[in-house]
Amino acid sequence: MAQERPSCAVEPEHVQRLLLSSREAKKSAYCPYSRFPVGAALLTGDGRIFSGCNIENACYPLGVCAERTAIQKAISEGYKDFRAIAISSDLQEEFISPCGACRQVMREFGTDWAVYMTKPDGTFVVRTVQELLPASFGPEDLQKIQ
């Protein structure tokens, strides 16, 4: 069954670059505890791609997910307008999905951008941030109490 593309649809050539970049980023994952490598690739409004991988720590709460690594890299270089992110893992039977913390961090930068959740065979599903985190809390909500 054909899947509807979100309104934030990304050009096919950008999607392919994102998917490849997320798979490449996964190779750099530092995950000695979970042995669950994840890679992410983030597409900015002007077409630049920032990649990231998960980085674990012996003090488990200090680890960081691939999605947040990519977003933090982009922010640290002055980018805040995002069009899409692709996420890769070694899960064979399911599409990799961002955790709740990553969904909230993505939400900080808008609700109508694409999240490509992949499998190693290259297949993917795409959802918007809004679809992954409905009824969310964002920066504009802070203005409602002033």
UniProtKB/Swiss-Prot annotation:
Highest taxon above the source species: Eukaryota
Binding site for Zn(2+): 65, 99, 102
Entry keyword set: Hydrolase, Metal-binding, Zinc
InterPro entries: APOBEC/CMP_deaminase_Zn-bd, CMP_dCMP_dom, Cyt/Deoxycyt_deaminase, Cyt_deam_tetra, Cytidine_deaminase-like
Binding residues for substrate: 54-56
Record-listed E.C. numbers: 3.5.4.5
Cofactor list: Zn(2+)
Gene3D superfamilies: Cytidine Deaminase, domain 2
Listed GO biological process terms: cellular response to external biotic stimulus; CMP catabolic process; cytidine deamination; dCMP catabolic process; negative regulation of cell growth; negative regulation of nucleotide metabolic process; response to cycloheximide; UMP salvage
Domain CMP/dCMP-type deaminase: 13-140
GO cellular component: cytosol
CDD domains (alphabetical): cytidine_deaminase
Pfam families linked to this entry: dCMP_cyt_deam_1
Residue positions of the active site: 67
Catalytic activity: cytidine + H2O + H(+) = uridine + NH4(+); 2'-deoxycytidine + H2O + H(+) = 2'-deoxyuridine + NH4(+)
Quaternary state and interactors: Homotetramer.
Family: Belongs to the cytidine and deoxycytidylate deaminase family.
Entries under NCBIfam families matching the protein: cyt_deam_tetra, PRK05578.1
UniProt function note: This enzyme scavenges exogenous and endogenous cytidine and 2'-deoxycytidine for UMP synthesis.
Protein name (Swiss-Prot/TrEMBL): Cytidine deaminase
